[in-house]
Amino acid sequence: MEILMTVSKLASICTMGANASALEKEIGPEQFPVNEHYFGLVNFGNTCYCNSVLQALYFCRPFREKVLAYKSQPRKKESLLTCLADLFHSIATQKKKVGVIPPKKFITRLRKENELFDNYMQQDAHEFLNYLLNTIADILQEERKQEKQNGRLPNGNIDSENNSTPDPTWVHEIFQGTLTNETRCLTCETISSKDEDFLDLSVDVEQNTSITHCLRGFSNTETLCSEYKYYCEECRSKQEAHKRMKVKKLPMILALHLKRFKYMDQLHRYTKLSYRVVFPLELRLFNTSGDATNPDRMYDLVAVVVHCGSGPNRGHYIAIVKSHDFWLLFDDDIVEKIDAQAIEEFYGLTSDISKNSESGYILFYQSRD
């Protein structure tokens, strides 16, 4: 039995090596970007949800640079962030250009910290992304809090203990945008607004549409009437009103989550909406508020987490990323170069929403400024 397992492992390693050398040949020595590395990640039992998100984040350059900079700081106690920094550093400092790395330390820490991921079942990539970004932000804020209490900040100042609002971290600098919820009373025309921060936007999907259309739908005007009337402070009573959500501040990296999993009452479970949703290589949002800080911001698609299968707890996740001027597909330990036109294969299906499909699930757009 042990001999068979050894032979199996050797065969797997040989296959990985063949894939790696084929990738190098396909890119070519002259075209291969300087100081860039393309490494697949070993799957530790349904950890493709994690691998795909990590690959997408690695190719969000501002995020990668901050994680690598964190690695160079004085050694901190082990956390999910130190494990991520070790993994990114390991990829970035490899002698080889292509290959495979086991993210074992990161996966072990993830399973230790959150029981949701402490099993060998398929998990939701969006839930993992959300957990990872919020956990990193919490770690950074706690470290800054400790520095304040010790009276030593990076700028050498001693900060006030009275400031109860956590400082924004580089996670917020990269991913955080602001929505403004505008409500207009239909009686007195008074407009009230409330701001809400986000690290990613979840948008509803429809058949044969585009991400631009989905984002417009995100800002559709909703009428509040009947039992859902709005309490107007000016009128001092409940009134009919119009409510809509607009983007007040666009983030450096816009993470868009397509809500492809819907609970079906008749099935008593979630099923996948494999709708065809076109996502362009370039994007500009038109649902910004009148006082938006950067309404004309242009974005380029840099990564997509793709769900393959028919449901949230079944199937597989892969990532497609843009590196310099070409696209790569990361499928756990396999890395392949693909044509830009091949991205159209991940838009979804034009019919039979419950059929297995490879469809874009999380989109990462990076701003040009």
Swiss-Prot record:
Active site residues according to the UniProt entry: C48, H316
EC number: 3.4.19.12
Family: Belongs to the peptidase C19 family. USP12/USP46 subfamily.
Keywords, comma-separated and alphabetical: Cell membrane, Cytoplasm, Hydrolase, Membrane, Metal-binding, Nucleus, Protease, Thiol protease, Ubl conjugation pathway, Zinc
Stated name of the protein: Ubiquitin carboxyl-terminal hydrolase 12
Keyword Hydrolase: yes
Cellular compartments per GO CC: cytoplasm; cytosol; nucleus; plasma membrane
Source organism: Bos taurus
Activity regulation annotation text: Activated by interaction with WDR20, WDR48 and DMWD through different allosteric mechanisms.
